[in-house]
Amino acid sequence: RPSDYSPPDWPNQNQVDSRDQQGPAVPPSGPVSMLESVEPTLAEQQFITPDKNPLVEKLMDTVKNDEDTRLYAIIDGSQAIELAYIARMMGHEAYTLFSGDMAAAVAHAGPCLVILDRPLPYLENWVESMGKNAGVLLQSSATLEALCVHLREIFVVKDEEGQDYFFRYYDPRVIRTFLPTCTDQELMEFFGNVTRWICEDETSEAYVSWTRKDSGLVSSAISC
């Protein structure tokens, strides 16, 4: 992290996690592997791929538009940790976005980043989780290390009084409220090396995609 980095102060009080008013220390830049071993109760389960939902094809059509990027999922372990285990059992790499003492304390409740170089059939499980506010999808052409640096930096935000807060941007309810309120500068800082954010909409029956253009924030619905 640059030595002169100052956490942005975009979200309002309702968009941050007030349970952690001190804010976490931003972890080291490199990715930290998670879920090195699968819990026995989960390892013994037979994970069944759901019937294909038409939304899966719509998601694939959207992300294929950015051929030079990789697709990732950020899973909120406090809402749907099973999605992280399913990803690992399907052969996807998963990394915790916390490290050190924080990673140990909330290993299965914090956010984790999953690389989806082969989106199918995992996206079928992702769509099946709609309504759980399980996390967000994103695309980036950055290296994994550079992406992790950015995703960790935007965890920490300041209020008007300079107090640090932990920003749960990977919660669909937060990001879809936050992004439309951003200025151009705030969008640039939040997007960083991310080219697209995707999360379920308020109905939990469709997705919304956001990209940043010269004209500002561009949103589009992903629905059947």
Q: Predicted regions span which residues?
A:
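Terminal low-complexity "docking" segments
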Residues: 5-11, 17-19, 23-167, 172-224
